[in-house]
Structure formats: C-alpha cells, structure tokens
C-alpha cells in the first residue's frame, strides 16, 4: 500500500514537472516578445513568474531524483557484494535523511517568515514559493525511507538487490 502511494506520488511529481516546463514557456515567451517587439506591452511580472516556476521545477526534479536514486555516485571500492552495497546505501541514506530534515525544518521556518508577504510584481503570496522547501524535505524523507527499507531487507537477507530501474516498478 505504501509503495502504491509512493509510485502514484512519483508519477504525479513527474506530471507536475512536465507541466511546469510547458507552463514556463508562456511567461518566458511573453518576456522575449515584449522585449523585442512593440506588438505586446512589456510584462514585468513574467520574470518573477518564470523565477517562481523555475524554483518549483528544481525542487520537483530533486524530489524525483531522490526517488529514482539518480543523484551522482563515486565508486571508491571495487565491486562489492549485495550486503556490503546495501550497508553503504544505508550509510549514504542517513546523510540524505539529514538533508531532508534540514530542508523540512529550515523550510518550514522560511515559509513562516513569508506567510504574510506578497511578491512585488506578480502579487503572489510568497509562502506559495517558500513552501517548496519543506515539501521537498518531506518528500525526500518518504522516498529515501523507502529506499532504506529496500537496502535493510537486502542486508537482512530477506530480499534480493533491485536494479535502479526495477526499484521504480516495484509497486506495480
């Protein structure tokens, strides 16, 4: 049940990321056209909207990256066995959980700071942008906990190691 939820959530995030890329084209295109032609007036708010969308795109991409385990790795040791690899994954995952906690806690403070403020040009509540940090931290925590569970099961001898691509299809 938890895997089904995380799979659904990962798919939702992927859809949101693709949608935000498509939506980002609108304010950026308006800004370009208004800068080089007299056909439309200069829209000052488009730069701010593009920046806000870009922030969300980066955060959603980071969430998906943790789910897929697509962050970079540096191989220091030669090929290790399944249990040793799982132990190293658990150790590395602890650091990712630490960063998730920092994003969650500091992001919440960041959001509270912006709660009653609005952006200058687009007149949007700033908490809508700042809430990306705690949501990212919480999402990292959920996705990384799932990955840690898989590594713990391999370490305990209850499961075989999964290839990264198969990890995503585990709930299907």
Regions found by a protein language model. Give the residues of each.
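Alpha-helical transmembrane segments and membrane-interface helix-loop junctions
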Residues: 1-172
């Amino acid at each position: 049940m938890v895997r089904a939820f995380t799979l659904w959530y990962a798919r939702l995030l992927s859809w949101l990321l693709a949608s935000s890329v498509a939506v980002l084209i609108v304010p950026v295109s308006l800004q370009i056209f208004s800068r080089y032609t007299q056909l439309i007036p200069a829209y000052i708010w488009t730069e701010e909207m593009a920046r806000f969308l870009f922030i969300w795109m980066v955060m959603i991409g980071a969430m998906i990256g943790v789910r897929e385990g697509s962050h970079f790795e540096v191989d220091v040791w030669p090929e290790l066995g399944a249990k040793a690899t799982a132990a190293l994954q658990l150790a590395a995952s602890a650091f990712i959980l630490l960063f998730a906690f920092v994003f969650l806690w500091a992001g919440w403070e960041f959001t509270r700071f912006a709660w009653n403020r609005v952006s200058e040009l687009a007149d949007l509540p700033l908490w809508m942008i700042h809430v990306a940090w705690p949501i990212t931290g919480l999402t990292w925590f959920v996705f990384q906990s799932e990955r840690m569970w898989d590594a713990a099961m391999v370490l305990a001898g209850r499961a075989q190691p999964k290839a990264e691509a198969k990890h995503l299809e585990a709930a299907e």
